[in-house]
Amino acid sequence: SKTTTESSTPNQGETEEEVAVQDFDIVNRTDIELEHGTITYTIRDENGKVSINSADKNTLNKLLEYSGVEDKIERSTISDSILDWIDSDKNHRLNGAEDDYYRKQSPPYFAKNGKFETIDELLKVRGVTEEILYGSKDSLDDEEKQYKGIVDHLTVYNIPTVNPNTASKEVLDILFAQEQVNEILENMSSKGFHSNTLSNYFRIKPTGKIASSRTEHTV
């Protein structure tokens, strides 16, 4: 799980950045020191998330409830609209939306009738707000509705079966019964952490920071 070279001294023709890449450690992740700053990174297993392109209505409703959508009709409207966005027909579900709804928006557009290519695309779907998707921003108003967000628990990849070893507690609670969740967590606790996993998709989020500066940039 660790891909590193024995030498930390640049060979002929190598730059400091190239050596830093060679010292990449997927398990014991630390800042990568460069000449003019540092790079930090996080790695998430996409197989430990819920696929937005294959989730059924019950799973979507649980995701929305977790984020903070308390009203059942609102949850049903969003989940039906997500399913309508993906399916190939022009017929909307009971509380869903198709072209007849989106053509009335400003500016007007069409339902995709195809799979999501990015998670941000959810913002085009009827009822989905930035707060529901990303979570509420810090607010001084205690009475303002707060949302947890679901973006970190979603993937666009086709995941036949979620990997329970890398799924978050939130994803486990959404996909499994409480008894199963307790069993999974107990097994993980007793067997310890294993650095290798047989997953197909990973998402790496790097953040660069300029030395002696508060400037950061995340890709």
Task: Put a short name on every predicted segment.
Residues 1-219:
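Compositionally biased linear targeting/interaction segments
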